[in-house]
Amino acid sequence: MKIPKFEAQTEWNIPTEFPDLRQVDEIAIDLETKDPDLIKKGSGSVIGNGDVIGIAVATNHYKGYFPIAHEGGGNMDKKRVLSWLKDVLEAPSTKVFHNAIYDVCWLRAMGFKINGDIACTMIAAAVTNENRFRYDLNSLSWHYLGCLLYTSDAADDSLR
């Protein structure tokens, strides 16, 4: 069986504005990190090794990715992005993460205060079905949406 692949945009444009998201009910946030010692020593947010390299934000009416420390360039002004993110995180809206404990730990290590409820899709998946073998975003995407966010031979084999 061929597994359908999610067709992600391969080209993205740096946002040209910092939208005011303080009044929305829910905000999905995903941090892209460089965490070189995660497997051996644990989260870089705890051991002080690694970086947040980009921030993805989505609401019902907005989606954007804010690169701040990509090695290949194309980054936005980090201070401006983090100042905007501070306002977003301090708003009373619900913040939705996948593996919230990881991303929230990074945000707190960076000095951010997070107001509003924190929802975690990984925990929600475990509560919904405690007998699943995997709770990673790719596996859940396959289960609930019938598509993969990324493919590899290992991912294909584990889902068959």
Which sequence ranges carry the predicted segments?
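Conserved RNase H-like, two-metal-ion catalytic cores of nucleic-acid enzymes
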Residues: 1-143
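Acidic Asp/Glu-based divalent-cation binding sites
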Residues: 103, 156-157
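Glycine-rich, acidic and aromatic/proline-enriched surface loops and short helix-turn segments
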Residues: 146-147
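Conserved small/polar residues in nucleotide/adenosyl-binding loops
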Residues: 150-155
